[in-house]
Swiss-Prot record:
InterPro entries: Ribosomal_bL27, Ribosomal_bL27_CS. Disulfide bonds: none annotated. Residues 7-19 have a biased composition (Polar residues). One of its GO terms (biological process) is translation. It comes from Synechocystis sp. (strain ATCC 27184 / PCC 6803 / Kazusa). Belongs to the bacterial ribosomal protein bL27 family. PANTHER family: LARGE RIBOSOMAL SUBUNIT PROTEIN BL27M, RIBOSOMAL PROTEIN L27. One of its GO terms (cellular component) is cytosolic large ribosomal subunit. GO terms for molecular function: structural constituent of ribosome. It comes from the Bacteria. Keywords: Ribonucleoprotein, Ribosomal protein. Residues 1-23 are annotated as: Disordered. This is Large ribosomal subunit protein bL27. Signal peptide: none annotated.
């Protein structure tokens, strides 16, 4: 039985926190200006109409409205925000 820890066990023993990425507002949901729509690494989803892109590729709404996920091409997705129609 060892009376000292091995060198590996003292250097291990940490785990990084989850990054909490993903879609935060889905298609059809209403958003206010500045609301985060997608948190991502890289551009899996591209910004469309009335959507801004942060330095960490986060997509956010530039106006109040309704979220709509669309296809730019067959392989590229984009998200847009359209003004809510008054009913």
């Amino acid at each position: 039985m060892a009376h000292k820890k091995g060198t590996g066990s003292t250097r291990n023993g940490r785990d990084s926190n989850a990054q909490r990425l993903g879609v935060k507002r889905y298609g059809g949901q209403t958003v206010t200006a500045g609301s985060i729509i997608v948190r991502q690494r890289g551009t899996q989803v591209h910004p469309g109409n009335n959507v801004g892109r942060g330095k960490d590729d986060t997509l956010f709404a530039l106006i109040d409205g309704v979220v709509k996920f669309e296809h730019k091409t067959r392989s590229r997705r984009k998200v847009s925000v359209y003004p809510a129609t008054a009913e």
